């Protein structure tokens, strides 16, 4: 047995430990065919950069689950991997190239992709280093990447099969266009933000100049693509105009007036300009009336030649120029300022442009129906918390067809080929013969990510061992922000292609926020690098904080104060471990287990030993129950209370009565219970704190704690009598300590303690354990009896089954205490007067920073609480001397 260093130093504890685990292959599946499999696939982080605190939280929860299941004897697989993240990674590489004055077009597709692969290799290495720092017990022999050949094969098969079923189609429709990334976006890649904008009201004159029709738009630059104006066919103001024409301002082109129910007589003037190539509703109107589709923008958001004098201008520059021209022509009626919702690209942040474009789509109605129907079966996916099942179903009920093509170079190139005759060939391999050109677009990143749970297991080969044994996976851990992006798509793709759900459970967590509750972002500058936190506090401290920060589905607020508390808790565990191991005298764990069995059988030990084993049993049961429900915060609270309060503050202190005695037989039993309980604590903690538990475990046992058995309940430890007795003993000791503190009597001063109880069993228990009472209360005189009369002047405390009297004469000089309290009251009054004067100054309140004013208000509340408490104490003292 070696000795723990005097001070807990996480850097020393964690250094080299991860590599030792990897060298020992402890993270690989056991291969035990009799064991029940338990598998998790890691939500693959994007190879766009370093991992953030949200990744640390997400992976910590997964590691807790997989480590516990491994210890419980499951055949566990935690499969790691990364996502190519098409649009995001390409944007990062293009940004790096721009800094060198190079564009992707300068390089060409192949050389540009070489640069992206270099980026991927660089950041994949960084991510794996971060995983190691976090202590993640993943099986690297099964690591996957979404552009691996095996996964690419799965992607091609899914695309081709859906195409053959008619569930993937190509067509020209209005899509969300990102002018910065120059690619299409799906609906859920668009973030809507309220922005300051305007409605521009303008007149379109009838061709005979008899009257003008007023229309309004937030995007006047699109008017060059107007091909009609629409009125409601039932609107008496305009129905006689249907079939006539108006003159499109600036362009001086005649466009028809059509009757369509899209025009709402109750909204605005009841007249709507129709721009089929730049608005989804207008596109539908155009389809109904066979109107032309005029696209007036380039893919970078500049105006094309159809915008006339405005060609080449950025769309927002063109907006102002168009409005100025309309005003010059007298066609601008007014500008109505208003805040409205505008879509922004989730990746680039650019304002999204609705744009007519030829794209590939997934038809969603049947896939969504399968997913919703499955939630009514025994094969459903269980969400934790359950409310997210409703979120999932609601989205599925309202889902639109999914645009899956992206105008990028980095990603899975669409397996479709075209020839000069206009034929399309879709297949897993290129068509035979010459004259075929592959579609240059790539698939949406989420298309390949949706196959992650089964493509990583070897699908479409369903005979491989991993697919047969570990699919469906057991649990997915992910944030609520990607239920739509990813979780839902994995479910419907898995059901369609494997006939099974992709995972049995989904544990949803929230977002990491800063101390003020704000989302962490670059713009706010409040992001936290988890590696910086680990460098200061250690991975175990960070993991403890992340696992205890919130309940499933809730956000967590990061603060360094909480990190300090996490470190302090581990330091406490370290110190009590040192105490136990230093007093261990060479006792082995096997010997300790044998001696503990004697305690459970009441053949050895004392009531405090039986009490701690009973409480350990309860702790094991409650922690396991909450782990099974993914309530790690509740489990952590139970562990913290047992370790710090019951074990360290009470049992370890109680054992000193034995360890400092001359009774060698009792010492062996006490050491055994200490070592046994510590061992179970370390095993319970290991899934959360892998490094420090391994370090301490190695001091008294062989092998790694990673693969030892997880604690289970021992029926023989149940002992309600011992539990009840020691809890009463603790109540008595606490009551005396509190009374001392109330009247400022030092623990070192001996006092008289009178314990009155009519419960003969309790009296016998206190009497037989009087040594513990004396050790913790320092009495000059201690009486325990049913015949005690209450003294006239005494502090009285009532606990279950007993009354405790502390004669006042032994405690303090009442007159001196009252004088001291009067001085204290005057002090708090003075502080209240000072802060009250400051807050009563209107100039101070008006001109000082809000946080300064709040600080003074906090002071006032604190002083008032102290003043009130002192007043109450004075009143109590007066009652005692009456």
From Swiss-Prot:
Q: Where, subcellularly, is it found?
A: Cytoplasm
User: Residue numbers of motif 'HIGH' region?
Assistant: 45-55
Which residues, by range, are in coiled-coil regions?
A: 808-882
| GO BP term (any one) | valyl-tRNA aminoacylation
Could you say which EC number(s) this protein's record lists? 6.1.1.9
Q: Which Pfam families match?
A: Anticodon_1 (PF08264), tRNA-synt_1 (PF00133), Val_tRNA-synt_C (PF10458)
Q: Which GO molecular function, any one, fits this protein according to its record?
A: ATP binding
Question: Under what name is this protein listed?
Answer: Valine--tRNA ligase
- Among the entry's GO cellular component annotations, what is one? cytosol
The function of this protein is: Catalyzes the attachment of valine to tRNA(Val). As ValRS can inadvertently accommodate and process structurally similar amino acids such as threonine, to avoid such errors, it has a 'posttransfer' editing activity that hydrolyzes mischarged Thr-tRNA(Val) in a tRNA-dependent manner.
Q: Which family does it belong to?
A: Belongs to the class-I aminoacyl-tRNA synthetase family. ValS type 1 subfamily.
């Amino acid at each position: 047995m070696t000795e723990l260093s005097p001070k807990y130093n996480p850097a020393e504890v964690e250094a080299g430990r991860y590599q030792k685990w990897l060298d020992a292959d402890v993270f690989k599946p056991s291969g035990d065919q009799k064991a029940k499999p338990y598998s998790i696939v890691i939500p693959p982080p994007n190879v766009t950069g370093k991992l953030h605190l949200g990744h640390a939280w997400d992976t910590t929860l997964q590691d807790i689950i997989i480590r516990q299941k491994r210890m419980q004897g499951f055949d566990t697989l935690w499969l790691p991997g990364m996502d190519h993240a098409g649009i995001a990674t390409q944007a990062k590489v293009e940004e790096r190239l721009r800094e060198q004055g190079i564009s992707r077009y300068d390089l060409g597709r192949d050389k540009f992709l070489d640069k992206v692969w270099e980026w991927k290799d660089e950041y994949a290495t960084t991510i794996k280093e971060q995983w190691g720092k976090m202590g993640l017990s993943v099986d690297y022999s099964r690591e996957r990447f979404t552009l691996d050949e095996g996964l690419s094969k799965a992607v091609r098969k899914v695309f081709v099969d859906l195409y053959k079923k008619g569930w993937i189609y190509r067509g020209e429709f209005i899509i969300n266009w990102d002018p910065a990334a120059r690619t299409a976006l799906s609906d859920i890649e668009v973030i809507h933000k309220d922005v300051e904008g305007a409605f521009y009201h303008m007149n379109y004159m009838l061709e005979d100049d008899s009257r003008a029709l007023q229309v309004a738009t937030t995007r006047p630059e699109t008017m060059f693509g107007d091909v009609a104006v629409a009125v409601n066919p039932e609107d008496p103001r305009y129905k006689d105009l249907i079939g006539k024409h108006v003159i499109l301002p600036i362009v001086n082109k005649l466009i028809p007036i059509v009757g369509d129910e899209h025009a709402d007589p109750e909204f605005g003037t009841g007249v709507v300009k129709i721009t089929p190539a730049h608005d989804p509703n207008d596109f539908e109107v155009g389809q109904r009336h066979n109107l032309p589709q005029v696209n007036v923008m380039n893919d970078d958001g500049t105006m094309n030649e159809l915008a006339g004098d405005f060609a080449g201008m950025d769309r927002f520059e063109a907006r102002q120029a168009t409005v100025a021209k309309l005003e010059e022509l007298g066609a601008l009626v007014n500008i109505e300022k208003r805040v409205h919702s505008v879509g922004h690209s989730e990746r680039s942040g650019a304002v999204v442009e609705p744009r007519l474009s030829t794209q590939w789509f997934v038809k969603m109605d049947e896939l969504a129906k399968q997913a919703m129907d499955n939630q009514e079966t025994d094969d459903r996916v269980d969400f934790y918390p359950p409310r997210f099942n409703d979120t999932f179903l609601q989205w599925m009920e309202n889902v639109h067809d999914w645009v899956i093509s992206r105008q990028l170079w980095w990603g899975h190139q669409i397996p479709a080929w075209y020839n000069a005759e206009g034929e399309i060939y879709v297949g897993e391999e290129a068509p035979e013969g010459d004259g075929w050109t592959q579609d240059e677009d790539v698939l949406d990143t989420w298309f390949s990510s949706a196959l992650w749970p089964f493509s990583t297991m070897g699908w479409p080969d369903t005979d491989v061992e991993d697919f047969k044994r570990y699919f469906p996976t057991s649990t997915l851990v992910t944030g609520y922000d990607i239920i739509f992006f990813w979780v839902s798509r994995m479910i419907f793709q898995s059901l369609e292609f494997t006939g099974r759900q992709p995972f049995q459970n989904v544990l949803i967590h929230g977002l990491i926020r800063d101390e003020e509750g704000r989302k962490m972002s670059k713009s706010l500058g409040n992001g936290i690098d988890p590696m910086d936190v680990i460098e200061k506090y250690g991975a175990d401290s960070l993991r403890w904080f992340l696992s205890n920060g919130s309940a499933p589905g809730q956000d967590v607020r990061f603060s360094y104060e909480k990190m300090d508390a996490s470190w302090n808790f581990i330091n406490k565990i370290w110190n009590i471990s040192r105490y136990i191991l230093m007093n261990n005298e060479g006792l082995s764990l096997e010997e300790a287990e044998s001696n503990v069995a004697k305690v459970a059988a009441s053949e050895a030990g004392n009531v405090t030993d039986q009490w701690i084993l009973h409480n350990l049993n309860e702790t094991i049961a409650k922690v396991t129950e909450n782990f099974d429900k993914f309530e790690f915060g509740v489990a952590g609270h139970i562990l913290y209370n047992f370790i710090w309060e019951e074990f360290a503050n009470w049992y370890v202190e109680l054992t000193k009565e034995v360890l400092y005695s001359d009774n060698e037989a009792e010492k062996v039993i006490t050491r055994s219970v200490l070592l046994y309980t510590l061992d179970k604590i370390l095993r319970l903690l290991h899934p959360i704190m892998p490094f420090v538990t391994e370090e301490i475990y190695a001091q008294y046992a062989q092998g790694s704690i990673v693969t030892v058995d997880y604690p289970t309940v021992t029926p023989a430890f149940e002992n309600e009598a011992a539990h009840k007795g020691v809890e009463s003993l603790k109540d008595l000791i606490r009551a005396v300590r509190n009374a001392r503190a109330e009247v400022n009597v030092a623990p070192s001063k001996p006092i008289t303690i009178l314990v009155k109880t009519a419960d003969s069993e309790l009296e016998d228990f206190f009497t037989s354990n009087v040594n513990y009472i004396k050790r913790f209360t320092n009495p000059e005189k201690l009486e325990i009896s049913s015949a005690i009369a209450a003294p006239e002047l005494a502090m009285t405390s009532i606990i279950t089954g007993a009354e405790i009297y502390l004669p006042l004469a032994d405690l303090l000089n009442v007159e001196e205490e009252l004088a001291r309290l009067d001085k204290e009251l005057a002090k708090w009054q003075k502080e209240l007067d000072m802060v009250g004067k400051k807050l009563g100054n209107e100039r101070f309140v008006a001109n000082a920073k809000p946080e300064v004013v709040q600080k003074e208000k906090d002071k006032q509340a604190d002083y008032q609480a102290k003043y009130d408490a002192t007043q109450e104490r004075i009143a109590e003292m007066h009652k005692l001397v009456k």
